[in-house]
A protein has these predicted regions:
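ADP-ribose/adenylate-binding Rossmann-like module
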Residues: 71-87
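Conserved N-terminal glycine/acidic-rich loop preference
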Residues: 2, 11-14, 50-54, 98
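Rossmann-fold dinucleotide-binding core
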Residues: 85, 91-152, 156
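Glycine-rich, N-terminal phosphate-binding loop of Rossmann-like dinucleotide-binding domains
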Residues: 55-57, 82, 123
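NAD(P)+-binding Rossmann beta1-loop-alpha1 motif at the extreme N-terminus of oxidoreductases
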Residues: 1-44
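Rossmann-like NAD(P)-binding element
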Residues: 44-69
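An accessory alpha-helical subdomain
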Residues: 148-279
Length: 279
């Protein structure tokens, strides 16, 4: 039996990715795109759906959840793609009586295959009603990682918050110093060239998206502020020429990382060998 699924914000990049993946790999799902103009007559697209997924900016998520719920049919699964999970999941649970699940696709909108792409699943309520959908995602190749919303958000504070903030600051500082990027690329080692490409990749995308991600919640903002203070304290030691403290800290981190450090060296070597032709 064909399932009906509606993506609110479906004309955005992640919505378009969902449409492309489902048309190729899950043709048994009839997908409907819901965009801003559809709020004139929302019941026409939201009623009688098996699944409704919100793919909207973080700052709009709570508002859209509350705006959507009155038009859902009984038993419709309500889910979201938001890159933070606790706040939207709490909102869906508090305001909707039907099945609820939080999803976070850990990949960009340019993927052409679901193979080995990670989707985080945060259980909400009435899991027996939505488990078939999660099973279908796994069946076509997505790697499903289940965790609580709290575990997800704590991890994403570092994976997205600290990481994106660090890259943002590096790009900002390169501009501040008016660095000639093309000259740097000519002189850069493969590893540094990769790092520069990561900076360029971030700034090729929308600033609003990264503002939302980096400043998504108070915990993330506070952790980034703590990180900045930590960097400043270490920068002072470098400015003082305190090599001894630097070496001790370096050794301590290396020991703390254990096998991850040498394995990372091997992994990046393999990656660089595969991608040696990139500019």
């Amino acid at each position: 039996m064909q399932k009906r699924i509606c993506i609110i914000g479906g004309n955005g990049e992640m919505g378009q990715m969902t449409q492309n993946i489902f048309s190729k790999f899950l043709p048994e799902y009839a997908l409907t795109i819901f965009d801003e103009s559809d709020w004139q007559t929302p019941e026409q697209k939201l009623a009688n759906q098996d699944i409704v997924i919100l793919s909207v900016p973080i700052y709009l998520t709570d508002e859209i959840i509350k705006k959507t719920i009155p038009y859902l049919s009984e038993g419709t699964i309500l889910a979201d793609y938001t890159s933070i999970k606790k706040e939207p999941l709490d909102s869906m649970l508090a305001n909707y009586d039907g099945p609820v699940v939080g999803l976070h696709p850990i990949f960009g909108p340019t993927i052409s295959s679901p193979e080995n792409q990670v989707i985080v699943v945060c259980d909400g309520k009435q899991q027996d009603k939505y488990q078939y959908f999660i099973d279908d995602l796994a069946r076509i190749g997505f790697s499903i990682e289940k965790m609580t919303a709290e575990e997800h958000d704590e991890a994403m504070t570092f994976i997205q918050g600290i990481e994106h903030f660090s890259v943002y600051c590096l790009g900002l500082f390169l501009k501040h110093k008016n660095v000639d990027i093309q000259k740097m690329l000519k002189l850069a080692s493969p590893v540094y060239k990769m790092e520069l490409n990561i900076v360029g990749r971030l700034f090729s995308q929308g600033p609003g998206l990264y503002a939302d991600i980096i400043m998504s919640d108070k915990q993330r903002q506070q952790t980034i502020a703590e990180f900045a203070e930590f960097v400043n304290s270490n920068a002072e030691k470098v400015s003082d020429g305190d090599k001894q403290t630097f070496i001790e800290n370096f050794k301590a981190v290396k020991e703390w990382m254990g096998d991850f450090a040498p394995q990372s060296y091997k992994n990046t070597d393999k990656l660089l060998l595969k991608k040696k032709g990139y500019e």
